[in-house]
């Protein structure tokens, strides 16, 4: 996964380990590691930095009071975070979307293998995937160790909340639940509010991490 994975201070100590999965870096120096990006977001002076709003929206979707530094830290201390696409993409201008589609189409097997290796190595049980494009690229063959968790929840015409389960016969070789939501950059356009997502995400997070 791109430039390593952010590991919260207590992520590996959780009884049920969580990975938050993003799509790719945007508007960031490609030399910056994922660990540095999240730590930059957690710095009090950088909470309004435009390039870090992705993390701000994720925190809101977990029901976090982002005005409290200690609440933000409590979330990010307990999770892993990584990006699916192995490249830094330019900002939300349109080129990034086209590039992402092309990269996933041509590198899906490699990206999935990187993800499988990480999930197996860290015994991840729950993934929150903040990109429907990435969610659709994950191993998804019905009847081969995976299944749909529930009927998709809609927000207007957009899918708001969707999920897939995996078992020992899947490429992940373990019980795994992957929950998907659209990428945060589309929320305003689709009329999606973080508090709508929090009603689904927060109970699962609390069950995993308390």
Residue ranges of each PLM-predicted region?
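Proline-aspartate-enriched helix->loop->beta-strand connector
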Residues: 113-132
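A Trp-anchored, charged/polar loop motif used as the substrate-binding/catalytic surface
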Residues: 1-10, 56-68, 105-117, 156-159
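C-terminal capping/extension of enzyme domains
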Residues: 99-112, 116, 139-210
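Surface-exposed cleft-lining segments at the edges of enzyme active sites
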Residues: 35-53, 85-109
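Short, contiguous, well-structured surface segments enriched in hydrophobic/aromatic residues
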Residues: 70-89, 93
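Short, solvent-exposed loop/turn segments at secondary-structure junctions
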Residues: 23-28, 85-89, 132-136, 183-187
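Active-site and ligand/interface coordination hotspots across diverse enzymes
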Residues: 1-54, 114-117, 162-171, 203-210
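A short acidic (Asp/Glu
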Residues: 30-32, 91-93, 131, 137-142, ...
């Amino acid at each position: 996964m791109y430039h390593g994975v952010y590991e919260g201070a207590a992520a590996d100590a959780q009884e049920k380990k969580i990975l938050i999965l993003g799509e790719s870096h945007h508007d960031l120096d490609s030399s910056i590691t994922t660990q540095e990006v999240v730590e930059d977001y957690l710095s009090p002076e950088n909470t309004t930095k435009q390039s870090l709003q992705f993390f701000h929206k994720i925190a809101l979707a977990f029901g976090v009071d982002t005005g409290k530094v200690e609440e933000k830290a409590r979330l990010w201390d307990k999770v892993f975070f990584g990006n699916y696409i192995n490249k830094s993409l330019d900002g939300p201008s349109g080129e990034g979307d086209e590039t992402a589609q092309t990269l996933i189409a041509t590198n899906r097997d490699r990206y999935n293998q990187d993800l499988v290796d990480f999930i197996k190595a860290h015994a991840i049980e729950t993934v929150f995937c903040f990109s429907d494009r990435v969610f659709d690229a994950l191993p998804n063959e019905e009847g081969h160790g995976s299944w749909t968790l529930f009927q998709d929840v809609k927000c207007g015409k957009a899918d708001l909340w969707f999920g897939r389960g995996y078992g020992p016969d899947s490429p992940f070789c373990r019980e795994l639940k992957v929950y998907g939501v659209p990428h945060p950059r589309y929320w305003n356009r689709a009329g999606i509010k973080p508090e709508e997502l929090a009603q689904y995400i927060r109970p699962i997070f609390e069950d995993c991490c308390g």
